[in-house]
Amino acid sequence: MKIAIYSAFFSTKSIDYIKTVIDYLKSKGHNFILFEKIKKHLGGLADSYNYFEDNKLLDKNVDFLFSIGGDGTLLRSISVIKDSKIPILGINAGRLGFLTTIKKNTLEEGLNQFFKKKYEFVERSLLEVQTKYKSEALNDFVYALNEVTINRKNTTSMLSIDTMLNDQHLTTYWSDGLIIATPTGSTGYSLSSGGPIVTPSSKCIVINPIAPHNINMRPLIVPDETTLKISVKGRGNTHLLSL
């Protein structure tokens, strides 16, 4: 089995967890490859390991990716697996751990259970983003695990967000922005904006306006095979798109 190890934030504690995982894998004879940004934190042993680069598709021989950190790290790990379907095992070394599987105080036991194949796969929906005009920010990564959000940038005025579902006009939202959330993301920004909680296995997406002018504009749930086309207008020349 070949494991890719990923981390995004390097506190003393998280480095300790990474080293513990490395030692465990070495003791069990498993092959592994490390995210390149881990290298400078490993001291004298750093040159003895293999590394993979940021935003580059992982080797097809990788069986699993271990994301060591909190929920934010796990979300960022999507950028290195993209649509390769490599499973992610979350190891919590951060503050939040809603998406991670192995907790801090059960690290070794959790790894033992994993390599005994005492796990199950849970598939999560991703959102793919395409823009009419080329954007350098989306050159390497166009997928979102939690949500895609459109927000105001240089204005306090509302946005006019024209929304199409499968080429059929849905509505024009007058609001501060719009959240398109997956079931995974339904407990994040969308929830704090009045959206529903959706179970991870639900094959749907949530369309949720942020502070809409018309209070009758409530969140809408649509099938996850839906293609959304969104056109944004406002007093500002630019708007924010976040994944």
Identify what each model region corresponds to.
Residues 137, 150, 166-169, 215-243:
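ATP/nucleoside-binding phosphotransfer catalytic cores, i.e., glycine-rich phosphate-binding loops
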Residues 14-15, 72-77, 187-192:
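Short glycine/serine/threonine-rich phosphate/pyrophosphate-binding segments
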Residues 95-176:
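Catalytic core of DAGKc-family lipid kinases
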Residues 115, 199-202, 207-212, 221-234:
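Structural signature of FAD isoalloxazine-binding scaffolds in flavoprotein oxidoreductases
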Residues 67-96, 101-104:
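Glycine-rich phosphate/dinucleotide-binding loop and adjoining beta-alpha-beta core of small-molecule
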Residues 171-216:
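Gly/Ser/Thr-rich active-site loops/lids in small-molecule metabolic enzymes
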Residues 41, 94-99, 197-198, 213-215:
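Short gly/pro/ser/thr-enriched loop/turn and capping motifs at secondary-structure boundaries
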Residues 1-64, 105-120, 131-142:
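ATP/NTP phosphate-donor binding region
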